[in-house]
Each structure stands twice: as structure tokens, then as C-alpha cells.
From Swiss-Prot:
The keyword Ligase applies. This is Glutamyl-tRNA(Gln) amidotransferase subunit D. It holds the Pfam family Asparaginase_C. Keywords: ATP-binding, Ligase, Nucleotide-binding, Protein biosynthesis. It catalyses: L-glutamyl-tRNA(Gln) + L-glutamine + ATP + H2O = L-glutaminyl-tRNA(Gln) + L-glutamate + ADP + phosphate + H(+). It comes from Pyrococcus horikoshii (strain ATCC 700860 / DSM 12428 / JCM 9974 / NBRC 100139 / OT-3). Heterodimer of GatD and GatE. HAMAP family: GatD.
Length: 438
């Protein structure tokens, strides 16, 4: 029996609050919750309940002994939030650009899906506090999973950000899925030139329908930071597992370091720019950030997309490097071992790449620390083969930067100069010992 037939037979509707008695290890177990519609990819023989703690549970129909309806679903009257949405002349204007993810979302009880909340009224319902901080202007640019983000999307975001800032907004918040947020933050950091106002990327590790969601606080802190004096691209996410404060990370030095923790984002080889509290308190952790100004931002969106990011591993074949050469790639960023090494038997292929005008850059898969190709013989061979050591750049940042650099020049000496030039805080001038695993 499918769940639709089961519900019809039992005279149960979507949204009803019910009690389910199921068999588990020979004993009866009781669950109470709201009936959710079957999800698109859920098994057809599974009843989904939203428990009172906010979490969903699936129960196989074959295990259900009986069900009882405790309360019928009620149609809630629409609440209008014009008072929140109406602009206030004393507040700054902030545009929130939606690209996907679950930073602000709502449950559709007809389909069971969680959709982005991106009209002004939907945002007011989801996170009304942000309308007390700024006049919010929401714009849904596109709605895709962050793993589907491509360079063309970075460019589209950059132009929309510039348009908003140059029209008088105090700052811009970009709502983005967390998985590839670091790549987009780096891309915007390089493309948005003469930036004079804050650009914040924000996401949520846990969606808004979960009681442990970090979405609301992240969004509140992001809007707070978007009105600050920092004229940089930043990622604002939870600073610890509780709901105390968020951290504002520089866009070129931030990485997602955990699959599910709310404080998954960390500044690597560097200190975050600030701690941000939902009540508006901002504690700056450094003073070398770019200050707010009246400059007009412009978009330098020349990107060479034929760039690869290759991770070194024991047994890696030179055929991988040869593949990218033969396919006409213009750049390769290598995540080397330790100080930036590869097996010696792939160095001839790397040399072939540089001799054919392909830029090859070296980062470290250690994540923390700095590439140094002068210490061991392997590193010196890589230098001789023409490899560009990328200091303490994150592999993701070096990948994005090489795309941007190659969009401006194919001359390898000029590529080397630009890769080793610090454009957006991607290179720290010295190795800090107070940032490791912080």
C-alpha cells in the first residue's frame, strides 16, 4: 500500500496531528506528530511525521499497528507584515540577493518541499528582526544548489552586487548554499574592484524548518555586518555551536571545515575580521580591513574557465596532467603534499605543461601553513619545471584567482607576478602561529 492510499483509508489529511503506534522489536512504540506530504524521493510506503521537536521521522506502513487523529489540520489566516516591510527613512538600504540554499525558507505542506522565502513578506515572516536593522530589498537572482554554481553564476552575482551598491545601498547580502560558498566569496573578492561597501555571503548549515537551524541568526548578523565600516567581501556564519555570535571572515581566507556543524566556517592562516552579535555589537579582531568609502565599484569579470584543480595522492598518474594539457587547459592548480610536493614521476608532465604555456600553481593540501619549494629536492625540481608556489593561499582561492589572472594575461611571467600579488588579502605576509585550528 502506498502512503496516499493509507491516508485516504484512515481519513487522515496532510497537516493533521496524529498518534502512530508502531511495532519495533516486538514492542509498541508511540510517535506523535504532524502528517507531512510524501517527498519527491521518499519511498512510497513510508509515512512522514514532523515531531513536536521539529525533526521529521519516516515510519514504514508495514510497521504501523494503528493510528489516531489527535487534532485536525487548521488553516491559518494569512498575516500581513506591511509594518515591517514599509521603508524607514532613518535606516540604511540593504539588498539581499538570493542564489539558493536554505538561509530563509518556508515549508510547502502541499509538496513537503522547503522553498526559499524571498519576497519581502516571506522574509518578514521568517526573520522579522532584519527589518528593524535596515530597509530590506530582496531579489531572487536564481535558485540553485551551490554544487551547481559555475563561473557564469559568479559573474552574474558580481554584476547584481555592483548594481545594488552603485544605486545607493549601504551594503549587500548574498544568500548562498554553504558547500561552495568559499569559491564564490573568492571570486567576488577578485572581481569587485574599488569596493567601497560591505558584501556579505551568508548561508545556513541547517534549514529553517529544523529547531537547531542557524539560518535566522546568520541572516541577522549578516545584515548587521552589511551596514558596518568594512568594505570587503566577507562570509558571515556562526562563530561557535551555540547562538552567541557570528564571525565575519575575509572572502579569500575562509573555508567550510565541517559537513554539518553550525560553526563549520573558519578563517585559514588568518584571523577573522570581526565577531558579530545579533544585538548589533561588533568586536573587530583586526584593523587592517578596507574601510567604507564613496568609490564606485566596477566588475572585472574576465575569467579563463579552462583551469583545473588537481589533488596529489599516492599513485597519481602523469596521465592526469597530460589529459589537461591535451584538452587545451590554460592553467592547473595542484594541491600538493606537505610543503607543496608531487611524486617525482609526474614532474616531466608538469614541465611539459609549462613549456606549452600552461600555468601550473602549487598549493598545499595541508590547508594550514605555507608552500615552500626551496626546502626539499622535489620542491626545487618543481620550481625548475616552472611551477608557481602560491604562498599560503587556499587551494580553492588559488583556483579562482588563476582563472581571474588568466582572464587578463596568458604570459607566464605576468601570470607569476599576478599570482604572487596580494589583491584581496589572499596572501598573508608572514605565517601566523595563532591561527592554527582556531
Amino acid at each position: 500500500m502506498r502512503v496516499e492510499e493509507f491516508l485516504k483509508e484512515k481519513n487522515i489529511n496532510i497537516g493533521d496531528f496524529i498518534r502512530v503506534i508502531k511495532e519495533e522489536d516486538g514492542e509498541e512504540v508511540i510517535y506523535e506528530g504532524y502528517v507531512m506530504p510524501p517527498y519527491e524521493l521518499s519511498p512510497g510506503d513510508t509515512l512522514v511525521l514532523k515531531l513536536e521537536n521539529g525533526y521529521n521521522i519516516g515510519i514504514a506502513l508495514s510497521k504501523i499497528r494503528r493510528v489516531e487523529v489527535i487534532e485536525r489540520a487548521k488553516v491559518k489566516p494569512e498575516i500581513h507584515f506591511e509594518a515591517f516591510i514599509e521603508g524607514k527613512p532613518h535606516l540604511p538600504d540593504v539588498t539581499i540577493i538570493g542564489t539558493g540554499g536554505t538561509i530563509a525558507s518556508r515549508i510547502d505542506y502541499e509538496t513537503g518541499a522547503v522553498y526559499p522565502a524571498f519576497t519581502a513578506e516571506e522574509l518578514a515572516k521568517a526573520v522579522p528582526e532584519i527589518f528593524e536593522i535596515a530597509n530590506i530589498k530582496p531579489k531572487l537572482l536564481f535558485n540553485i544548489f551551490s554544487e551547481d554554481m559555475k563561473p557564469k553564476h559568479w559573474i552574474k552575482i558580481a554584476h547584481e552586487v555592483a548594481k545594488s551598491l552603485n544605486s545607493g545601498d549601504s551594503g549587500v547580502v548574498v544568500a548562498h548554499g554553504t558547500d561552495t560558498m568559499g569559491y564564490t566569496a573568492a571570486a567576488l573578492s577578485f572581481m569587485l574592484r574599488d569596493l567601497g561597501k560591505p558584501v556579505i555571503l551568508v548561508g545556513a548549515q541547517r534549514s529553517s524548518d529544523r529547531p537547531s537551524s542557524d539560518a535566522a541568526m546568520n541572516l541577522i548578523c549578516s545584515v548587521r555586518m552589511s551596514t558596518s565600516d568594512v568594505a570587503e567581501v566577507m562570509v558571515v556564519m556562526h562563530g561557535e555551536t551555540g547562538d552567541t555570535y557570528c564571525l565575519a571572515h575575509r572572502g579569500t581566507k575562509v573555508r567550510k571545515m565541517h559537513t554539518s556543524r553550525r560553526d563549520a566556517f573558519r578563517s585559514i592562516n588568518d584571523v577573522p575580521i570581526a565577531k558579530v552579535w545579533p544585538n548589533g555589537k561588533i568586536e573587530f579582531l583586526r584593523d587592517d580591513y578596507r574601510r567604507r568609502s564613496d568609490s564606485e565599484v566596477w566588475v572585472d569579470d574576465k575569467l579563463e574557465e579552462k583551469v583545473a584543480l588537481v589533488k596529489v595522492y599516492p599513485g597519481i598518474s602523469s596521465e592526469i596532467i597530460e589529459f589537461f594539457i591535451d584538452k587545451g587547459y590554460r592553467g592547473i592548480v595542484i594541491e600538493g603534499t606537505g610543503l607543496g610536493h608531487t611524486p617525482n614521476d609526474i614532474i616531466p608532465s608538469i614541465q611539459r605543461a609549462t613549456e606549452e604555456g600552461i600555468a601550473v600553481c602549487m598549493t598545499s593540501q595541508c590547508i594550514y601553513g605555507r608552500v615552500n619549494l626551496n626546502v626539499y629536492a622535489t620542491g626545487r625540481r618543481l620550481l625548475k619545471a616552472g611551477v608557481i608556489p602560491c604562498e599560503d593561499m587556499l587551494p580553492e582561492t588559488a583556483y579562482v584567482k588563476l582563472m581571474w589572472v588568466l582572464g587578463h594575461t596568458q604570459d607566464l611571467e605576468e601570470v607569476r607576478r599576478m599570482m604572487l600579488t596580494n589583491y584581496a588579502g589572499e596572501i598573508t605576509p608572514y605565517t601566523r602561529f595563532d591561527t592554527y585550528l582556531r
